[in-house]
Amino acid sequence: EVLAALSYYPELKDTPIEFKFKDNIRKSTMQAQPTFGSIFRAKEKRQYIILMSRKIQIEDEHFTMKDIPSEVLIGWLGHELGHVMDYRDRTGVGMIIFGIKYLFSGAHIKEVERAADTYAINHGMGEYILKTKNFILDNASFSDRYKAKLRKLYMSPEEVMHLIEEKQ
């Protein structure tokens, strides 16, 4: 799945990205970030890590990566690679400010998550992003409250479809 997602981002070919499983990522399934030691390096020399949770808990539902359909995982990875694309043009100080805003501003989170989806869609991953959204939103076990939170922060399937159609 990692190689499939990376194939949509040829400009990341020479960018060091480590994909690493972690037992638990707080409030997240996957997380992309520059490595701590590379934040203040020249943008071209920055390294990234994409953490992937071994165990995924969404409300009372428990999953492992093996439980997630391949196309959904590719979509999730494509979204995270969209974050890497977003980070590439930011300075070290810009990344620190970005991180602080992400911690404290819901509006900033919404902007950043939508940007990551947009990068993925513009790189031809729209169908994967759509499958990822539908995997969550069509899951009867997840509460309406949880789904409403996702709809607030991330693009809706309709918005994804609109961008896919615009791109064609």
Language-model-derived ranges and their functions:
Residues 31-70, 87:
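Active-site scaffold of zinc-dependent metalloenzymes
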Residues 48, 72, 144-147:
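Short, contiguous hydrophobic alpha-helices characteristic of membrane insertion segments
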Residues 68-85:
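Short alpha-helix carrying the canonical HExxH Zn2+-binding catalytic motif
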Residues 71, 86-114:
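Post-HEXXH active-site segment of zinc metalloproteases
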Residues 109-126:
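An active-site-proximal "capping" alpha-helix that borders the catalytic cofactor pocket
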Residues 125-168:
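Long, well-structured alpha-helical subdomains associated
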